């Protein structure tokens, strides 16, 4: 039953698979997919369904649907029908046909009177609406689809058509599938429209219901046709906009440009004799005409130089001669017929090429060119060629059959009848073929098993492995042929044989030595170029008549040309098929065989030769330019760097009019992006899609897909409107956390911004048309105006004013300075020429005018007032930094760099103001010398003033008390003493509890005086009487109320009356009280006013003295500061000195404040707070009112009462709820005081230590036990933290705190190659040089390289973060000897590493070395280098952890290095001018011949010591250089032979190293450019000695940089690291074995480098017995035999049983396992996968599948699939 069920399931599955793979289902699927290819035709279809109504509307719907379906049916038929496919599949055909119809339709809908739109009958012929609707839907369906392009579907259809048998069924089923999808789509659209009409909620929102918009809606409905036409026009223009117009392009010049060149004759003559008749490569009629026209007229166009190349074809005599003597040339007749047809169809040919040449109208798109090839390849030629061949014993069609072989086979069949024979039956051929293969297979199997058996016997592996078959000279001597000449080898190992030069004279000895002993094919001797007379002498045994020169190709004639003499035929054939001549004595025959042509395939190329714009610029003479440039190069300009004029005799000058100048020039490229891309002028090109340029100056075009990863917000980026999101975020966070910190841009960032602005300005001037002409003329006029008008006028005005002010004029000094100013003409980049010499084409290319020693107007020259020592030093420093040159701008201003910001001129009036200030100061110092004494005795004066003040106040209070006592003895009111006593009674407690407070002393004495006046008895009696009266009145009132309540009920009016009575009574009571107390109130106010007036009078001298002291203090501070050299500035905003305040004692720096704040008593703190001035207390009032509510639980009640009585805060607002005891009770109080207001750094120290734990986690290495030094340093670091972290005096040592804070943050965030100088962390303070050096010394970061016992550095130790890929390098300042860290981004707008912006919780990723780190988890953007080849990721990670693996650079070069230890001496520099300045002066005094070869001796600076670079080239690269040098020498023979020495030197240098990218160091870059610019200017001068010293003093010339020696020591420059040569990727001539070794060597361990130290012995085990691991047993065989063995096994795979196939193999299974799996533990699944993948390649023929891809162009061999073969095999274990 189970078997039956499985059988049913198997049948169902197979049935389903058959249905799915059937032609009908696949066709329905592809047809349904084409429904989603929505194009412009859907606009017409929807318009007809939506807008049209009525009877005519239904007709339009039907016609639109019919036309739509008919158009799609034509598209499907074109898949099967080839002519229709050629017509519709070529897009330009549809474009040419659709454009007129589109314009017609557009104007028809927009023009009112073009057709009559009135009501017409159905039978009228003028009503073309329905027909036009049908045509619209039919034609626009044939267009290329708009939303979803149909190229993908067309490719899928073509692939399925290639492997489908029933093609018509496939086409019909796909059309049916499309029809079903279209019906469903239209039904869905209809349902949506009905739903919109029925849904009231949607219709209510539409404006149609309102009467206000009915007119607009009707207008909209009437103009829908126009709207649809506009939409259609926009879509079609968008489609057509991607293709430029083919009409307005540059045409070729016809045959004159296509023919007549040397290479064209080579193409026409070296191909097969009849290529156009049999080859598919000559399909195009126009190309046939071109080739035939060249061949017919070939003899007329032969030049003297072309004779050698053309004689190959014409000496072989294609013209065959009959026995009658009539010459016949079938090709010639064919050419004549074609010529007549061309004359007949004179107009048809250009029209056809214009409309139907869909690939290129006029010229190709690219022009492939190098040193060997100077003609572009015809990209119309395809390498697909179908022909029948025998495969697996049967005839099959091959689509990669060689076309030349097929044509040759057809020629042999037609021309030689004896070669044709009857074909054998297919079965017989198959059986013979299978038997041969079986025999081969058996032999291979036997050999394979024998090798395995010998391997079991423990033979050496070298003897068992099969070696490649080589060709030997003799059987006895095992001497192999060289690899180049070995026929059994193929590929790169064969090498390249250098051709002999065409006109080289070859002697007989050379022939005997080289060719005398070699074997030569006779067929080559007959068919190739041979001297006919000497050849006939060697063939005397044959009949000369039968083998004459005219008839030597007669055997290839037509079948009707029969030969009479059969014996002669037999002799000829015997001679032809005796392949080898063994007689070496036939010297005449051998001599003529020197000119063998190399057998290769000639690629069809265009005949014309084009040059680029760059070649036109680089051309030396105008005569060398043959034609106008035809290739658009990148925008560039030619800059002349050096001009040399040869001196001649006077007699020679008379004869010759002008001397020619030899120039050395370079090409300057624009900073703009290059969109020309070496495209041929006039060729059709497609626009670059998916690239956007939103900046005016942008280095590279970026895709909008990566727009979210760019920091810019807008699509434009001007410097004034740019918006940096991340920069703004940093600023906000930094301001939020640190309000006191100022944000400023560093100098490096500012310089980058200015550099970018300069480049933008330079590019705008260079790009705007006629801008350079305007700018150059304005600059010249500005220099003339400045030198001749403006500056002399200023000199006249200045000296005339001096005369008016009775001062001596300075005419001579000013004119001398003006004469010193020089206006040097420079190129656009700033290269100096001379003062009078203008650069070539300066109007169009641009000019710069450099002003040397610019003139600045000064009020006087020799100052009469001598400056101090400090001022003189400052002046000397300014002169060192000052550059005595500038560049002139268009506005007449000065800049330091071309197109830079304007330079600030030294002010004319500033020295005048300074001189006036000095004189005023000198005048002030004389009368105020006494103030110095007051300054010294300031404390004494303050104490005396304070004591006087206290004495006056005490006396005043005493007098005031006496006066009050005398006044109180008079009339005393009744109620007055009683009130005073009550007040005294309430305040006695507070006075007794706070006797220490001095502010209450006045009140206390006054109260005591009043208490002595009254006696206690009187007061008691009065109080008793008042109480009895009050009690009586209350009793009477209660009785009255009871009587009224019992008699009458209360009314509403009565209540109002009672309330009003009560309010009136209280008012009356208060008035009486006021009247009673008014006397005392007035008296109290008078007393307070008198006291205030008296105190003010007393304070007048105090205020005046205080102001006097303050003014004198400021004056003395200024005076003392300016006279003392090392004095520090005193803060002008210092707080005022209060005599009463005692806070000054708390703020003394000598005392230490501990962290334990509990030691302070509350009474002491609040007492000191109460002693503060009112201004300070007022600031704290709001804080105290709020904070005491929180901390009221901890504050004593007496202190609260005191503050409440003083009026600082209201006691009733206190919250008496319990507060959490964990809250720091003093924290909020102490924040309000300056001395306790701790900075954020200190609070961070007192807080948690999360960030410190993060530091410790980051610094942990995976294997902690590797180093002892690391752990030792860690312990020191931890102990240091424990000792210094909670120091008591750390708050009072700000320098130490800041230093510690920098150290911790540097350890966290700062890396060696960080891109920012400002640390992006919590503090945000720039690093101090001292702190960095202290940090490096203290924590021994410098000593990391001194780890001796660790053999290899683990890169996971370095937990640094990188934001961009930058080139950073350490540099040393020779003056300060402090280490800095400097980073520079050298590539302009280069996006090296993509970082996702805007992600929440953004993390700093781990250091991604080479993009291969395995620990990156959250990184969204993966490394794209290993996206396609993930297998290499594991290789790279193991390589990083085990550096002894064979390095990857071995795949590129073979380094042959020689390490030499050179002792380098760096002499100390003394003096202002360097020690080698004398050599530099001597250098300029040399002759002209010595100037070119002079340089400097070997010397090295401190910076150069650290950058020593060893560079070496491999032997293979040197061979490549020699080959290219030979080619260049040949190429430049036609150019000028007489060159100057400088040109020869530069050509030789560039010829040797032109294949290398040359770059220099950044430090070397800035200095060398400045020195070179000055050097170019100095070379032109006659006497440069005067300017050399000044330029050396100013620092423009650094003599250490210039190399003063007779030869250019490039090796020393390389070692010093100034110059670095990076090799360009070139094709290396490596052996096949070397490539295999390098490929396998990546995953293997090198024995020499894997030296195991003692500490690693316990961790790993190495198997010494097993030398290698076999991937597959087949690896014993050679690769060629292995492939053959696999293919032979896989033949007849279905017929063989498993037992038969493995019968021989099963016997040896145990032995095989012992060989392979002894002491190995490989997984079984992995082994099965290995076996599967090893046999997958030959079984399923992946070459054929890969060729079906769209990348099949130009792939004739399987080299492109080599990487696929490599990646099919998995990586194995390394033991």
Swiss-Prot record:
Keyword tags: Chloroplast, Membrane, Plastid, Plastid inner membrane, Protein transport, Transmembrane, Transmembrane helix, Transport
Residues spanning the membrane: 19-39, 68-88, 91-111, 133-153, 176-196, 227-247
Protein name: Protein TIC 214
GO (cellular component) term, any one: chloroplast inner membrane
Annotated compartments: Plastid, Chloroplast inner membrane
Subunit structure, as described in the record: Part of the Tic complex.
Record family assignment: Belongs to the TIC214 family.
Source organism, top-level taxon: Eukaryota
Single Gene Ontology BP annotation: protein transport
Membrane-related topology note: Multi-pass membrane protein
Matches recorded under InterPro entries: TIC214 (IPR008896)
Region (Disordered): 1491-1512
Disulfide bonds: none
Function, in words: Involved in protein precursor import into chloroplasts. May be part of an intermediate translocation complex acting as a protein-conducting channel at the inner envelope.
Note: There is a partial copy of the N-terminus (positions 1-343) of ycf1 in the inverted repeat (BAF50598).
Lineage start: Eukaryota, Viridiplantae, Streptophyta, Embryophyta, Tracheophyta
Species per Swiss-Prot/TrEMBL record: Lobularia maritima (Sweet alyssum)
